[in-house]
Amino acid sequence: MSFCDDREGQRALRILQARLIRSPDACSFALTAVSSLLRKYSIDPRRIGRLEVGTESLVDKSKSIKSFVMQLFEESGNFDIEGVDTVNACYGGTNALFNAVNWVESSAWDGRDAIVVASDISLYGKGNARPTGGAGCVAMLVGPDAPIAFEPGRRGSYMAHTYDFYKPDFTTEYPYINGKHSIECYIQAVEACYRAYTKRERRATERLEEERPDHQAGYETPLDRFDYLCFHSPTNKLVSKSYARLLYVDYLENPANPIFAEVPDSIREVEYRASLTDKSIEKTFMGLAQERFARCVQPSTEIPNMCGNMYSASVYGSLCSLLCNVNSETLLGKRITIFSYGSGLASSMFSLKVRGSTKQMAEKLDVHRRLVDRVVVSPEDVRERAYLKKCFKPKGGAGPIPADVYSLAEVDELFRRVYTVKS
């Protein structure tokens, strides 16, 4: 926070972020997360047939982060592992996940499992975006008969050409960002994905010869068919606005619904483009959504709120938060809807169904203890001056490295990166 010119309390309050983190690079994150997944779940490395990484934190314009992670499979002799890196801002992890699921469902599947990794570090220059920076990595095992399953037919996407956030300058990690436009793009995307999801869901339920889609029966409003939601989280405030936007879409579809009785008729007359930034719409529906948000979304906000924007890992950090904040018995049979967004832009909304116990996942994740155990250091202690440098060995200053965590040990004279693990 002290990197920012604004007073810490003011900025933290306005964007609703609590704590931020810094760490070496996306490769060390991925190595740590995948090795942890293999170790904690006693997974035989030979059982993995696909590994794909979603990231925008590239350390090399040619060599993939996935290729660095292959070090973990050398001892087992398993070099027959498909997949590389997927890049599109914060959306790469979701595209990697879709690819893994498609692989398991395809004729190319050989019976083994897949691992999906979302690993990123977000960095910004001076300005309003800097306090939202963060870092994180999530590794996921994908295979048949999982306790959390994709729901067929419940997915919608929205893709467009925008310049809301991009990184054309390869001499710096800082993006070019139009904050106001980026928020508009995000809100536009969440609405478009919701509409596309609903349209595809309707077709899927019609194919099953159901009388009508379940989003029209048994709920106060269609949004209630989502038991829980996890959003890509640049800031917690944007997540709140986005959930409210979904309720606004429900209102437009059925303004006569009694839950919208207090909504002024004039709101229906606001033109679409203007509605994306209309403060009266935002305020009205954030107020209406408050109770639902606390029940359906708030349990998923802990990690993004405490770790800042983790780019491709952000929405899956939200999923981890949900698994650790809602017990397995409560989650069983529930629908978890995910909204993933990456600037430029690519976005999708899809649903998962909890059909088995999530208790072991929560225990292995151990989110609450790990967040509390973090070491607070000053920005000066983690400020790195090694970007684009060779013949470099990182020096201490950011606290001790925990056991089983990988870190960058050296960049040699040919820019080859060496990682070591703390035993």
Curated annotation (Swiss-Prot):
Its EC number is 2.3.3.-. GO terms for biological process: acetyl-CoA metabolic process; ergosterol biosynthetic process; farnesyl diphosphate biosynthetic process, mevalonate pathway. One of its GO terms (molecular function) is hydroxymethylglutaryl-CoA synthase activity. Keywords: Transferase. SUPFAM superfamilies: Thiolase-like. Pathway: Mycotoxin biosynthesis. Gene clusters encoding host-selective toxins (HSTs) are localized on conditionally dispensable chromosomes (CDCs), also called supernumerary chromosomes, where they are present in multiple copies. The CDCs are not essential for saprophytic growth but controls host-selective pathogenicity. Hydroxymethylglutaryl-CoA synthase-like protein; part of the gene clusters that mediate the biosynthesis of the host-selective toxins (HSTs) AK-toxins responsible for Japanese pear black spot disease by the Japanese pear pathotype. AK-toxins are esters of 9,10-epoxy 8-hydroxy 9-methyldecatrienoic acid (EDA). On cellular level, AK-toxins affect plasma membrane of susceptible cells and cause a sudden increase in loss of K(+) after a few minutes of toxin treatment. PANTHER family: 3-HYDROXY-3-METHYLGLUTARYL COENZYME A SYNTHASE (PTHR43323), HYDROXYMETHYLGLUTARYL-COA SYNTHASE (PTHR43323:SF2). Belongs to the thiolase-like superfamily. HMG-CoA synthase family. This is Hydroxymethylglutaryl-CoA synthase-like protein AKT4-1. It comes from Alternaria alternata (Alternaria rot fungus). The lineage of its organism: Eukaryota, Fungi, Dikarya, Ascomycota, Pezizomycotina.
